Each structure stands twice: as C-alpha cells, then as structure tokens.
C-alpha cells in the first residue's frame, strides 16, 4: 500500500481499480449479482454494467433484506458546485433503494464545504437547496416519512454528540496513515462523515443496524475510518460496521474525472440544452485517427466518453446498448452519427428534467430545513 493513497477531497483523480481490491480489501461486486437479483429483482443498470464494481459487506445487506430487516441507506453531497451527471449517478442509486423500501438518509455536507472548500456559507446553503435537493426531487426522490435530508449544521443533538465521542477514540497518527497530510478542517470533516454514516443506528434515529453507503471509490478512506470507529463503539453504543458499495467515476468529456471545477469538460443538469449538446459533440471518443482507419479497425467504445453516457445514463435497455457497442467495434457506427444520436437522447432528457426541476425548486423546503445562519 506504500505510495498508493486515496484522497477523498481531490477534485480530479485517476484510480487503478484493481489496486483497490489488492491493497484495501474491497471485494468485487459482480459475483453478488445473482444474489442481488434474488433479493431485489432485476439489478440496477449500474450494477449490471459493472459501474458499481466493489463492495464491503454487501452480502449482509442482501441477507438482511431477504430476512425482512430494516435497512438504511446513507449518502450525501458536498454543495460546492453545480449538479452534474456524476452526481446523478449517486441520485439514481438513492432513488433505486427508496423504491426497495430502504430508509433514506441524505446529508448535505455544508460544514465540510465551508471548512474544506472554504466557500461562502450563504452560497453553500443556496447550492445545497436549489442544485442538490432540487435535482434529487426532479429525478424522482419522493417525500415520505422514510426519507430524511439534512444539512450537517442543522441537525439533531445526538448526531453532534457522536462527533465529540468519536474524537476520543481516534488518534492523529491513525488518521494521518489513512489520509496523509491533515489540517483541522479535514479532521473535523472526517469525524463528521463518520457521524453521518453511523447515526441511523442510534435508537433516536430509528435504530437501523444495517446501513449501506454507496460512494465513489475515492471516498473509501472515510468508509475505512468509519468502520474502525464503529467497532470501537460496539459495546458502548451498539454500533456495527456499515456496508458500502463503490462506483466508477463519471469521466469528464476530456477523459479525466468529471468535476464541477472543470465546467468545460462537465455536463451539468442545469446546462442549457444547446450548450450541453455542444459540449457532448466536442467530447473525446474512441474513434481512430481517420475515418478510413476506423472503418478498417473499428472504434474503441471502452475509451469513448460518449459511449459512457449511454452506459451510465442515456440507455436503459441492455440489448440496445450492446448493439451500439458492437456497431462501433464493427465499424458500422462512426463517431459523427454516434454523437448525433447521443445528443438527441441527451437533449430529450435535459428538456424533460429541466421542466421538472423548475417545479422542484418550489418544493425544496418540503424536504429539508436549511440552517438559520
């Protein structure tokens, strides 16, 4: 593991996913697909297509679900920029689990955005409400008694007590081994995230002893720390290690990680449709240097950011997706027509989504109470 460390606060990162299995003990998700189908029915497309690629203790979640146990999902968003398709991948998972009957806890990490990203507090709250909560609503998150959205700085007293208690049983040396160089803001953020993940297990919040956390692979340092903390508080508070799943990054249009800090290579769900389409048509593809070469050798959809939009978001039907893949590999689909088709699907999605988003922005306060200052 020497020389290979994950940074959960980096805005751009390249991961070698195989190393996550080898160095950090993450298990492959694909062998669980038959059990997922037995428990939940047809697996989510992100599961079927290998985008959700790894897990910790997910078999315990499947067993608990089959046994009729109550299960909580916990995940969150740092409101530091506009909501893009990488965020949508997390939202899609939240909505999937809501439909399965999981208790849903979504944290808007405003304390972390303020301390680590050093953004203006009022702007953070505005982004949290009208970018993140509003887009969740527009994508289909329902309001019910089993769904809880909260800001880190405006929650219940037992949650804050957890943060204080956790600080007693974690050493600076231990945190440095996980995260590397640290500053007070990151220590606070890590302990707060542990409370975000573990608080549903307290009786005050429902006593959910089975918790699953879907995250990007770069967030595994938080998961490892949280699992260690849970074990240390098993006797005192009855905490259990949370399960987790890991998904691949949404690639930016230049082939690097999609990020709000790189808007020219990122498609936001609030982009005007013509701008989003223009961005997509400039995207890196898996095409060859010339049309003649592509007709001879075929394309490489594995390297194509446009194909990735099909894979992650734009095409639900696996048979249709397979045809596009094979047509690209077999030189029957060239990059120009492919981008035109992807642009049509993207435009249709954004037009419909943005109509829902306008209505959703009027409803955000039904879902969450913002901080008072």
Swiss-Prot record:
Entry's localization field: Cytoplasm
Major localization listed first in the record, in broad terms: cytoplasm
Pfam families in the record: tRNA-synt_1b
InterPro entries found in the cross-reference section: aa-tRNA-synth_Ic (IPR002305), Rossmann-like_a/b/a_fold (IPR014729), Trp-tRNA-ligase (IPR002306), Tryptophan-tRNA-ligase_arc (IPR020653)
Reaction catalysis annotation: tRNA(Trp) + L-tryptophan + ATP = L-tryptophyl-tRNA(Trp) + AMP + diphosphate + H(+)
Motif interval(s): 'KMSKS' region: 257-261
Enzyme class: ligase
GO biological process: tryptophanyl-tRNA aminoacylation
Signal peptide (from-to): none
Motif 'HIGH' region, residue range(s) on this chain: 79-87
Gene3D superfamilies to which the protein is assigned, alphabetical: HUPs (3.40.50.620), Tyrosyl-Transfer RNA Synthetase (1.10.240.10)
UniProt GO cellular component terms: cytoplasm
Domain of life: Archaea
A GO MF term: ATP binding
Keywords from the UniProt entry: Aminoacyl-tRNA synthetase, ATP-binding, Cytoplasm, Ligase, Nucleotide-binding, Protein biosynthesis
Record-listed E.C. numbers: 6.1.1.2
Keyword Acetylation listed: no
Similarity-based family: Belongs to the class-I aminoacyl-tRNA synthetase family.
HAMAP family xrefs: Trp_tRNA_synth_A
Protein's UniProt name: Tryptophan--tRNA ligase
Organism encoding this protein: Hyperthermus butylicus (strain DSM 5456 / JCM 9403 / PLM1-5)
Lineage: Archaea, Thermoproteota, Thermoprotei, Desulfurococcales, Pyrodictiaceae
């Amino acid at each position: 593991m020497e020389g290979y460390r994950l940074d959960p606060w980096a805005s751009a990162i390249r991961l070698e996913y195989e190393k996550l299995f080898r160095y950090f003990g993450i298990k492959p998700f694909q062998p669980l697909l038959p059990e997922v189908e037995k428990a939940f029915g047809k697996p989510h497309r992100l599961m079927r297509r290998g985008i959700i690629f790894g897990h910790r203790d997910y078999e315990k979640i499947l067993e608990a679900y089959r046994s009729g146990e109550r299960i909580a999902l916990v995940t969150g968003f740092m409101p530091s920029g506009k909501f893009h398709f990488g965020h949508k991948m997390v939202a899609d998972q939240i909505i999937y689990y809501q439909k399965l009957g999981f208790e849903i806890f979504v944290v808007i990490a405003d304390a972390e955005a303020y301390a680590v990203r050093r953004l203006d507090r009022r702007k953070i709250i505005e982004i949290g409400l009208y970018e993140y909560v509003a887009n969740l609503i527009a994508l289909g998150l329902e309001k019910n008694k089993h769904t809880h959205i909260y800001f880190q700085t405006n929650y219940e007293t037992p949650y804050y007590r957890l943060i204080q208690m956790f600080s007693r049983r974690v050493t600076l040396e231990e945190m440095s081994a996980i995260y590397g160089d640290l500053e007070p803001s990151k220590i606070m953020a890590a302990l707060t995230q542990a409370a975000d993940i573990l608080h549903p297990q307290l009786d005050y919040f429902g006593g959910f002893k089975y918790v699953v956390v879907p995250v990007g692979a770069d967030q595994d340092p938080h998961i490892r720390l949280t699992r260690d903390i849970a074990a240390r508080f098993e006797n005192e508070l009855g905490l259990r290690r949370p399960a987790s799943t890991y998904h691949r990054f949404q690639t930016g249009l230049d082939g690097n990680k999609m990020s709000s800090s790189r808007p020219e290579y990122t498609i936001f769900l609030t982009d005007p449709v013509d701008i989003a389409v223009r961005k997509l048509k400039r995207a890196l593809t898996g095409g060859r240097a010339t049309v003649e070469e592509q007709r001879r050798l075929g394309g490489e959809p594995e390297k194509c950011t446009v194909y990735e939009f099909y894979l992650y978001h734009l095409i639900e039907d696996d048979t249709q997706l397979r045809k596009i893949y094979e047509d690209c590999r077999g030189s029957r689909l060239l990059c120009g027509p492919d981008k035109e088709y992807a642009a049509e699907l993207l435009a249709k999605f954004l037009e419909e989504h943005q109509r829902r988003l306008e209505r959703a922005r009027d409803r955000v306060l039904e879902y969450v109470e913002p901080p008072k200052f």
